[in-house]
Regions:
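Conserved phosphate-binding elements of NTP-dependent enzyme cores
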Residues: 1-284
Length: 284
């Protein structure tokens, strides 16, 4: 092609694909009440569990009472936020703990409902890893564990269940979205497009991410990744190297092929790095 961005045609088994998903690093929701477990629908199962407890049945608490998004069981002073925001005209807004619920987001009678000694607030304070261990001890909570496991699979076992989505980094938000796709029971063949998913990740986290991406592929999906990380490029089935330089001096296809084929291309900067990795692996 004469100009960057031009193309002649697209070919492949596109008729087999049913959807295309661009998985970006934007927040999973604009709502401050949104969190990873509401996004993956795990909280629906947790609310049902608490509504089934003896005290809930005695007081006629439905699952809706354990939601901080609707009136009923939530603290109405902070509307389930756990905090109060004071607007400051010439400074950053001041966020303070709600004096009514002391940051626990719910009314006291809701907090009095316990499952194995834990209130709904206690569960929201658990990390994903802690929650999976906690609920795995009860076979009746299999649905909850099934919903939470994908967060572990993408390396997010350290985040809290009730952690606001606004506190997640771009990379964490992207992995929450990836976890939601892994959790889907219906596997419509989909093309997933990721833009620099390894940004800010340690090498161990990258290895976890690659396992999750390979699960998508095993489920019949196609994954397209825009990436500079050599570990990810080496794991690819097919590489398209754009260049030769960056910015306006790039955008042209330098070479394509397997990582090994790209490594043998003399004009590819990417190939030089891949060749070093391949040589290092052979030396071991």
């Amino acid at each position: 092609m004469e100009h960057t961005g031009d193309f002649g045609h697209i070919k492949g088994s596109l008729h087999l694909m049913r959807d295309i998903e661009y998985v970006d690093q934007n927040p999973i929701s604009r709502s401050s009440r949104s969190n990873p477990v509401t996004y993956l629908k795990a909280y629906d199962e947790i609310r049902r569990l608490y509504a089934e407890q003896a005290l809930s049945k005695q007081l006629d608490f439905s699952p809706a009472y354990f939601s901080f998004n609707t009136p009923g069981g939530r603290c109405e002073t902070c509307q389930g936020e756990g905090t109060i925001t004071i607007e400051m005209q010439f400074m950053a807004d001041l966020v303070i703990e709600c004096e009514q619920c002391h940051g626990k987001r719910f009314k006291q009678d809701i907090l009095d409902v316990h499952y194995r000694g834990k209130s709904i607030y206690d569960v929201l304070c658990m990390t994903v890893n802690q929650a999976v261990e906690f609920f795995s001890e009860d076979e009746t909570c299999a649905k909850i564990v099934k919903r939470l496991k994908p967060l572990q699979d993408v390396g997010l076992g350290y985040i809290q269940l009730g952690q606001s989505s606004s506190t997640l980094s771009g990379g964490e938000s992207q992995r929450v979205k990836l976890a939601s796709f892994l959790a889907q029971e219906e596997n419509r063949p989909t093309i997933f497009v990721f833009d620099e998913p390894t940004t800010g990740l340690h090498q161990r986290d990258i290895e976890v991410l690659l396992k999750a991406l390979n699960r998508l592929i095993s489920n019949g999906h196609t994954v397209i990744i825009i990436e500079h990380n050599p570990s990810v490029i080496m794991a690819a089935d097919h590489v398209i190297d754009l260049g030769p330089e960056g910015g306006t001096e790039g955008g042209y296809i330098v070479c394509t092929g397997t990582p090994e084929e790209v490594a043998r291309h003399q004009e590819s900067y990417t190939g030089k790095y891949l060749a070093q990795i391949i040589d290092s692996n052979h030396a071991k």
